[in-house]
């Protein structure tokens, strides 16, 4: 099942039918450990409506967005390449093998955008890429109950100059996009699920790639555990789980590019670059 956030409330998609939830609070509704069961019960008493996916907002209200780094081999390679001259390559090699994952703060809801909105590239950066990522929704008790698509916009030249510049390379206005919905399955997401991306420039395909989430180095539950180990999230939290798709080093995003990220079972997150 899927939940869509709109100005009028919450749209539930179940068995290819749509329902407008009686619940108005996004925070309260999604932050339930038994969310799948709650939705299943709710749709039994709701009236089916006609809806054509208009007015979709980012599926976030008062949550924070965090992110994981170097969780796929391709990400490890790319980080090592961009930081070779600064002497930081070893840090990425070590964190890929370490027990403790790399976690960093990505965005507040106010800085985040949803599908159909524009993401940004930093004005002081010349090498920027999108990073397509499966994104977890974790309740305040630490349970993974849903998934969405994340675009972790990144300034590779800034992070490559010095690993300590990562917060500037990763966190700025409109550097995070999530959506289009919160996917709430009965069981954990299928490990064979495919993530794919295409980048269009003036209608022409500039880059595409895909990867299965079973290629991730770490268990999703372990990433969630480390995030919640010493922090509380009263409304739950979103956690991007890292990327396994990185364009070649000669590619950078330009204003006007369109980034489409698709994850099987969830949908497509589409954003133009500002």
Question: How should these model regions be labeled?
Answer:
Residues 1-73, 270-274:
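Generic N-terminal segment detector
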Residues 38-201:
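Active-site microenvironments in enzyme catalytic cores
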Residues 7-8, 13-17, 138-143, 200-203, ...:
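Short acidic-glycine loop/turn motifs at beta-strand connectors
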Residues 156-274:
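Catalytic-pocket segment enriched in acidic/His residues
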Residues 7-8, 132-134, 257:
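Residue-level marker for the onset of beta-strands and adjacent loop->beta junctions
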Residues 1, 15-16, 26, 33, ...:
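Generic intrinsically disordered, low-complexity segments enriched for polar/acidic and small residues
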Residues 18, 36, 91, 104-105, ...:
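Phenylalanine-focused residue identity feature
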């Amino acid at each position: 099942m899927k939940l869509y956030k709109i100005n009028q409330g919450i749209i539930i998609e179940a068995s290819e039918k749509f329902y407008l939830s009686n619940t108005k609070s996004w925070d309260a509704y999604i932050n339930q450990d038994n969310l799948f069961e709650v939705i299943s019960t709710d749709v039994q008493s709701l009236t089916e409506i006609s809806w054509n996916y208009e007015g979709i907002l980012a599926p976030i209200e008062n949550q924070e967005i965090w992110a994981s780094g170097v969780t796929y081999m391709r990400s490890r390679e790319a980080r090592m390449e961009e930081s070779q001259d600064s002497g930081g390559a070893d840090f990425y090699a070590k964190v890929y093998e370490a027990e403790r994952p790399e976690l960093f703060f990505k965005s507040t809801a106010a800085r985040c955008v949803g599908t159909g909105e524009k993401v940004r590239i930093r004005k002081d950066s010349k090498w920027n890429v999108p990073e397509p990522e499966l994104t977890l929704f974790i309740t305040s008790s630490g349970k993974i109950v849903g998934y969405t698509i994340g675009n972790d916009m990144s300034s590779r030249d800034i992070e490559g100059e010095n690993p300590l510049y990562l917060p500037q390379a990763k966190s700025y206005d409109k550097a995070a996009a999530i959506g289009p919905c919160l996917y709430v399955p009965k069981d954990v997401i299928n490990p064979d699920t495919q993530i794919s991306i295409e980048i269009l420039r003036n209608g022409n395909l500039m880059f595409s790639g895909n990867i299965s989430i079973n290629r991730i180095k770490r268990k999703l539950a372990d990433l969630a555990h480390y995030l919640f180990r010493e922090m509380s999230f009263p409304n739950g939290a979103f956690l991007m789980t890292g990327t396994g798709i990185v364009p070649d080093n000669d590619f950078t995003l330009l204003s006007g590019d369109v980034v489409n990220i698709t994850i099987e079972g969830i949908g497509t997150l589409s954003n133009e670059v500002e």
